[in-house]
Amino acid sequence: MEKLTDLNYTLSVITLMNNTLHTILEDPGMAYFPYIASVLTVLFALHKASIPTMKIALKTSKCSYKVVKYCIVTIFNTLLKLAGYKEQITTKDEIEKQMDRVVKEMRRQLEMIDKLTTREIEQVELLKRIYDKLMVRSTDEIDMTKEINQKNVRTLEEWENGKNPYEPKEVTAAM
């Protein structure tokens, strides 16, 4: 008799739910019902999946607070993704990791700038030394005759009798 009563009760609950769903779906204002139902389904699945996970994590881990915080942040991030948001919740640990990464990259870039600055200073010093060596020589000491290959050419003062041998002379010819 009890089984029959349970069966009747179960059938009446199912009938009541079916009637309720049919009346809700017939109402034109409930156009968003499938979306609401899918969100509720996801929330229920997350609830059912997270409770055993949390129990196991709390029993097996030494730092239960971090695990609980990580699980809650993960659940909220999942809900935000389902809602279509691109932003995520981050914990202080993740922010500290990102800050450490940024600081490390800045240090690396500062070292690179320091190396480049040192190299540039060395190049400037080298150019200064080259310039100083070039400026020490005066033009009076440089013998240009070697450069233009004119060692045997005489100047006007060195010519005999001060006459230019290349000037044309009067030539008389017999006819």
From Swiss-Prot:
Query: What kind of membrane protein is this, topologically?
Result: Single-pass type III membrane protein
- Positions annotated to bind Ca(2+): 120, 123
Q: Which residues are glycosylated?
A: 8, 18
Q: Which residues lie on this side of the membrane: Cytoplasmic?
A: 52-175
Its subcellular locations are:
Host rough endoplasmic reticulum membrane; Host membrane, Host caveola; Secreted
This protein's UniProt keywords: Activation of host autophagy by virus, Calcium, Enterotoxin, Glycoprotein, Host endoplasmic reticulum, Host membrane, Host-virus interaction, Ion channel, Ion transport, Membrane, Metal-binding, Secreted, Signal-anchor, Toxin, Transmembrane, Transmembrane helix, Transport, Viral ion channel, Virulence
UniProt topological domain (Lumenal) ranges: 1-28
Q: Which residues cross the membrane?
A: 29-51
What does the function comment of this entry state?
Answer: Plays an essential role in the virus replication cycle by acting as a viroporin. Creates a pore in the host endoplasmic reticulum and as a consequence releases Ca(2+) in the cytoplasm of infected cell. In turn, high levels of cytoplasmic calcium trigger membrane trafficking and transport of viral ER-associated proteins to viroplasms, sites of viral genome replication and immature particle assembly.
| Domain comment quoted from the record | Binds 1 calcium ion per tetramer.
The record's note on quaternary structure and interaction partners says: Homotetramer. Interacts with the immature particle in the viroplasm. Interacts with host CAV1, early and late in infection. Interacts with host integrin ITGA1/ITGB1 heterodimer. Interacts with host integrin ITGA2/ITGB1 heterodimer. Interaction with microtubules blocks trafficking to the Golgi apparatus.
The UniProt family comment states: Belongs to the rotavirus NSP4 family.
Q: What is this protein called?
A: Non-structural glycoprotein 4
Lineage here is: Viruses, Riboviria, Orthornavirae, Duplornaviricota, Resentoviricetes
